[in-house]
Design a protein with these regions (language model features):
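Acidic/histidine-rich, surface-exposed loop or edge segments in extracytoplasmic proteins
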Residues: 29-42, 79-84
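Histidine-anchored nucleotide/phosphate-binding helix
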Residues: 48-68
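Sec-dependent signal peptide recognition
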Residues: 2-10
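Structural recognition of the beta-strand scaffold that forms the well-ordered cores
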Residues: 35-38, 76-79, 111-114, 154-155
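Hydrophobic h-region of N-terminal signal peptides that target proteins for export
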Residues: 11-19
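A cross-taxonomic marker for long C-terminal extensions/tails that follow the last structured domain
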Residues: 88-169
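Soluble non-cytosolic domains of exported or imported proteins
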Residues: 41-52, 71, 92, 96
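Acidic helix-start/capping segments at beta-turn-to-alpha-helix junctions
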Residues: 68-87
């Protein structure tokens, strides 16, 4: 009897683990997005990684099974860190790939906003930026503005990848 009482919990654990099996894919019924991206980066080259966050949301919702038209999505990207140098016209050659990606999304309706206070700190005026950029008075006030209008706040976090997927799998 004692042996049975000791082995019963182990047996139940094994059965429950077997019964659970593999994970389950859930097709969440996402509505068209209303999102504001808060981009404040320590290094302007991190903009490439931050734009993957925009791409991830945009592509998920414009492809099957959702198939939303770009005009159904309401996406705003607010730049107010070192990355604002990437959208200064004089730096276009240096950040060409990032500028082209932002222009592509801007042409599809994504709004790209730059904090006017940050621009001033960097010595930029409105005329210094790419033609798809809108300069707003203040990034923090702008974030509050969009959130009060029902936009979800997304803050890209950029980490240095130290291990490959194969190393940690």
């Amino acid at each position: 009897m004692k042996t049975l009482l000791r082995t019963l919990p182990i047996l139940l654990l094994l059965i429950s683990a077997w019964a659970r099996g593999a994970g389950t894919f859930v097709q969440t019924p996402y509505p068209p997005a209303k999102a504001v991206f808060d981009v404040y980066l320590a290094d302007p080259h991190e903009i490439d990684s931050a734009l993957y966050w925009v791409r991830s949301l945009f592509n998920t919702l414009t492809q099957a099974p959702y198939n939303y038209a770009p005009e159904d999505l309401h996406i705003v990207v607010i730049l107010h860190g070192t990355e604002i140098v990437t959208v200064a016209q004089k730096n276009e050659t240096k950040y060409r790939e990032a500028v082209e990606r932002m222009r592509y999304y801007a042409d599809l309706g994504v709004k790209f906003l730059v904090c006017g206070q940050a621009a001033e700190d960097y010595g930029y005026s409105v005329r210094d930026f790419q033609n798809f950029i809108e300069v707003v008075p203040n990034a923090i006030a702008e974030l509050a503005h969009w959130q009060q209008r029902g936009y979800a706040l997304i803050t890209p976090r950029i980490y240095e990848k130290r291990l490959s997927i194969e190393q940690i799998r």
